[in-house]
Amino acid sequence: MARYNPLAFTSGPVVFFITITYTALLIALLLTHLTLPSYPSHPPLGINLTQAWSDLEHITREFHPYNSHANDNVRAYLLSRIEHMMASKKLGSDQVQIIDDNISNATFSSGNTTVYFEGTNLIVAVRGSHDDQAFNDRNRRPDNGGVLVNAHYDSVSSGYGATDDGVGVVSVLQLLSFFTEPKNWPKRTVVLLLNNGEEDFLNGAKAFMRHDISQVPHTFVNLEGAGAGGRAAMFRSTDTHVTRFYRKSEHPFGTVVSGDGFKKGLVRSETDYKVFFEELGLAGLDIAFIEPRAKYHTIEDSTRETSLNSVWHMLSAAIATTSGLAADTSTPDRESHDDAVWFDIFGKVFIVFQLHTFFALCVTLLVVAPLTLIGLAWSLHKADRNYLFARKAFVYSADDDEPIHLYGWRGFFRFPIAFGIATSIVVGLAMMLSAWFAVSWFLLHGADAMRPSALQRMYSLLWLFIGSFCLLVFFTILANNHQVAAGYPSLFCFATVFLANVLSFLELFLAPPKSAYAWNVHQNADGGSRPLTSSATAARSDNRATTDDDATETTSLLSGNRRSFARHDAGRRDAINEGANSQEPESRRRLDLGQPHSGEQEWSGKLPSWIWIVQFSLLAPMIVILVGQIALLLTSALYQTPSDGNSPLYIYTSIAALAVFLVAPIGPFIHRFTHHVPTFLFLLCVATTIYNLVAFPFSEQHKLKVYFVQRVDCDTGVNTVSLTGLDGYVQRIAGNMPSAQQSSLNCSTPDIVTRKELRMCEWEGLHPNVVSPTSQYSNKTRATDWIDYEIFHDDSNNRGRR
């Protein structure tokens, strides 16, 4: 009885190792994505996490949008905290400058909107130990630049603003405490900005641009929030140089895919990053909370929904990044913004390199990989061991021999057919990893059961090579022509698929030469002896498969036993000379062909049965880690954005594609699975599909958001209310509004380009009683008297002012 091999390419080891590997990797990815590192019991010198949490609770007691009393209270509290903090520090007033900016203002136009804004920013500048110039010096040296750290202290009118941007604000306060410790004194000047008015047109950052100190920094770190708790991700960056400093973070988190998605408009919101990079010309990065987006700009953006662990995750990243930038004494090049490729691995390791490097590696691999496989195929051919696409072999020549069938084509088209059908089903369902697995297994296992092939795994890997080659070409073009770095997984995936294929080609060098195998089969057939295999059952199975494959509607019923005299005579001559085997060439020696897998080609019996586990170990971990991270991030960041106006089709297609890439490494090995796992996944697919199609899509934890706008024409007094949201839902919401009960709804496509995927329903609204009708104010509530203004035009300077 043959000994059991725990690494053999059989059902037991395949199911065990693949299940364990995927389970371990997916659990690790989920834990990294959903859990937070604990804050330290002994934080760095100058950091007080208890005080940070107290500050966060104080500034988020009320909604505090710009131009509200609560906003004024928050500003007064922050200013008092800064002054109190500086009173207890040893750095003198010549090293720390507090700027209570009530002067800077901004006027700008965008489309049909003109904005005039008066800033109320708070700025603290910690002079660097290497900075010997005045902050207002217009001729500051390029090598004397500083670092800007920004957060905004205003909230939206519908939320407390704990993560948007309370955590960023308290992080800035702690950075001030950190850098004013003599041991932490930075080499470069650190400008700490608490701006007011980000939620409306990024006004606070635009007002900062008008202040002289805005010319001091040459890099920036922007702290933002678009969720409620969780990890703070390195959301986007301007170039490779500044991104490398984030690598020093204790718990790095993020991928360049988020930055590319932001550039392509997948997230319909902006941050102060836009002003600092595009208008001030600074190099820097965004560190932001990105989920759960359902709580973004809602009443649930509160301290109850976040934690001190979240505060520490953002603060620790800000400390590491800002410290690195402030210690960098190299001369900045404001004209050079080399795009970066960056991603983390399990929140522990941060990889960053230039997009140019990515392009060079892609081109190199696209050239080297095919040439290597072609070289290996040629070597196999020269060694007479290339069974790929080999239909038959001859003992002597094609003129006088009956062919010995090798069945090298068997299984070639299985993988692309199964892959295409399974992928189509996944895209059609817009969900379900289980659907792809179940359908692929049914097709590939069924084909293997009917026509077993030792080359099915190798052909599947070849198809993966072709597919990943095309994918890498696509992303290489995107990287070179459009500076899109999101395709970085394709480089690593193609490299692993290439190495797995190299192993498959090398494996064939251990197969017997085709001529030797043909001679052995010929000898066994003519001499009436059995092949020298370890199992007669395997031989009979292989012979049965051979007969089935040879038979056609034109095949003679006697062809299986037919012998010519010449053949019989040749067999006798061979039998007579059988004793001289030791003096004959390798192709004329008897071979121990080993035991092939049930029904597979007899020549495959001696191939090592453990190669598959090396191939799987190359394929699965890298692909699952890189693609799984992106899938989790995009799903959590984008699943709520259709209510913002994003196209659901693009999001569903992206998720389906990522789901397919995630399970594709199983494809070459899936035909060895028993029915138990696919059956379970199929039932899971059916159950979850029914639930997802029947269940109401929104809940308390996953709310539907709509845009509410009320317009009052100050000339005519016409008052219009509108709700903009998802078609089919916004009509029901608007119809239940009390003010709409007696009015007719007018639903149409919004004029705003970014909301074309939504519907806007309008009706005549209630008149807004800004001032009580019984009050003694002179202008009462007449809309025509709400605004009094005059416009002066200075012809001499061609300037206008309000």
From Swiss-Prot:
Its cofactor is Zn(2+). Its main location: membrane. Glycans are attached at residues 48, 102, 105, 112, 746, 779. It is found in: Vacuole membrane. Gene3D superfamilies: Zn peptidases. Pfam families: Peptidase_M28 (PF04389), PFF1_C (PF22250), PFF1_TM (PF22251). GO terms for cellular component: vacuolar membrane. GO terms for molecular function: metal ion binding; metalloexopeptidase activity. Coiled coil: none annotated. The keyword Transmembrane helix applies. GO terms for biological process: proteolysis. Keywords: Glycoprotein, Hydrolase, Membrane, Metal-binding, Metalloprotease, Protease, Transmembrane, Transmembrane helix, Vacuole, Zinc. May be involved in vacuolar sorting and osmoregulation. Belongs to the peptidase M28 family. This is Vacuolar membrane protease. It comes from Leptosphaeria maculans (strain JN3 / isolate v23.1.3 / race Av1-4-5-6-7-8).
